[in-house]
């Protein structure tokens, strides 16, 4: 897919939540930003404003519909000198679904379900958590969205989506993507088959 992607994509992971701090798997649960997360969203908006300057008006803005991404998008847009909305939302940009594991920590899962935790560790890209989805399934969900992009786009989404983008657009091997660190308060730029953090 990277060979066919000619636009520039600015990826922002949502700001911090209390579940991030606690190490809980959020998945598709609707968890709000905490104070630090709101500060991160505003800071990344200022970074984008300075980085993009006159090109801001040419961007398409799209977010996952979950609360933490909508909040992040609104705050960063205000920091960029834009109204908090409107911006588009797309269900395909929701976080990877962890199913029955949502709300739990990896430590708890490893303790209570060691066999399933080991199965996931053996194939992090292809493993499907109970009632959830794999990274491979998430990749199939976001491919049509990527193919639909017509111009440079700023997207606010989730760590799992960023890992899939690293594989589809940034040349990362699927086996490496599930453990790639995806930071909050920074911008991941995809362009010409490569990815770089700003």
Identify the role of each PLM range.
Residues 17, 161-162:
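Short active-site segment of divalent metal-dependent hydrolases/proteases
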Residues 4-7, 16-82, 133:
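Active-site-proximal alpha-helix that buttresses catalytic centers in soluble enzyme cores
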Residues 172-198:
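Domain-level recognition of soluble alpha/beta enzyme cores
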Residues 75, 164-168:
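Active-site signature of alpha/beta-hydrolase-fold catalytic machinery across serine-
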Residues 22, 78-141, 179, 191, ...:
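Phosphate-handling substructures
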Residues 10, 62, 88-90:
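General small-molecule cofactor/ligand-binding pocket signal
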């Amino acid at each position: 897919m990277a060979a066919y992607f000619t636009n520039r994509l600015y990826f922002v992971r949502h700001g911090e939540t209390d579940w991030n701090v606690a190490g809980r798997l959020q998945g598709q649960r609707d968890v709000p930003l905490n104070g630090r997360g709101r500060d991160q969203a505003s800071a990344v908006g200022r970074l984008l404003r300075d980085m993009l300057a006159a090109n801001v008006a040419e961007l398409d803005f799209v977010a996952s519909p979950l609360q933490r991404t909508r909040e992040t998008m609104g705050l960063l847009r205000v920091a960029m000198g834009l109204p908090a909305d409107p911006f588009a939302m797309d269900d395909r940009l929701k976080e990877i679904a962890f199913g029955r594991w949502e709300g739990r920590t990896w430590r708890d899962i490893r303790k209570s379900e060691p066999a399933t935790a080991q199965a996931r560790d053996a194939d992090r890209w292809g493993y499907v958590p109970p009632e959830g989805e794999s990274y491979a399934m998430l990749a199939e969900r976001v491919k049509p969205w990527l193919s639909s992009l017509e111009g440079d786009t700023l997207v606010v989404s989730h760590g799992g989506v960023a890992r899939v983008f690293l594989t589809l657009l940034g040349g990362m091997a699927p086996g490496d993507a599930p453990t790639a660190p995806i930071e909050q308060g920074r911008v991941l730029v995809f362009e010409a088959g490569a990815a770089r953090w700003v």
